């Protein structure tokens, strides 16, 4: 009976831990949603015939700042200091930024879980490559960081350059070059 009581107490403790971590993760996902929404707003604004080259440069600056915010959120740690998106890699930052601005994932592709009953385990975190790098479309996978880079690059072309950036069109980022 004591073993059963101890096991039940451990399951309850584990459920509390998972619930707390999920609240922290929900907060990060809310912030990610806000950044993605703003990026989509910028994309919609670029379709306006009243957007000047100067506005496009400002959009590029804002999108670059949002990429930095996405990078910080991707490396967010929980109250215990573990990376929310590091998989099983623990306390180190799962995403790295090189000198060329390329972001790579060095976390684990697996997720942590805790046992909360005899037959149930609940996830404690997410693998960052699934959240940020391996987003799927009907045709392929893409990185949210690369999509933002594509958008920024397209904003650096003047309006008459016959190049268009389309962030998250059909879940992907594309660049179209129109015939002259």
What are these regions (language model features)?
Residues 1-20, 26, 88-180:
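Bacterial flagellar/type III secretion structural subunits and associated motility module proteins
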Residues 1-91, 122:
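Amphipathic alpha-helical polymerization modules
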């Amino acid at each position: 009976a004591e073993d059963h009581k101890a096991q039940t107490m451990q399951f309850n403790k584990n459920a509390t831990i998972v619930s707390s971590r999920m609240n922290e993760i929900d907060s990060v996902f809310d912030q990610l949603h806000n950044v993605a929404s703003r990026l989509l707003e910028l994309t919609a604004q670029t379709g306006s015939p009243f957007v000047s080259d100067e506005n496009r440069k400002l959009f590029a600056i804002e999108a670059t700042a949002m990429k930095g915010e996405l990078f910080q959120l991707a490396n967010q740690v929980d109250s215990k200091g573990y990376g929310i998106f590091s998989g099983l890699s623990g306390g180190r930052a799962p995403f790295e930024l090189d000198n060329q601005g390329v972001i790579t994932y060095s976390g684990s592709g697996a997720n942590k879980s805790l046992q909360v009953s005899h037959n149930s385990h609940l996830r404690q975190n997410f693998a960052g490559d699934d959240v940020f790098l391996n987003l799927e479309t009907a045709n392929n996978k893409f990185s949210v960081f690369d999509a933002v880079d594509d958008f920024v690059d397209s904003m650096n072309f003047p309006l008459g350059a016959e190049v268009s950036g389309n962030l998250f069109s059909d879940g992907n980022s594309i660049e179209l070059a129109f015939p002259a």
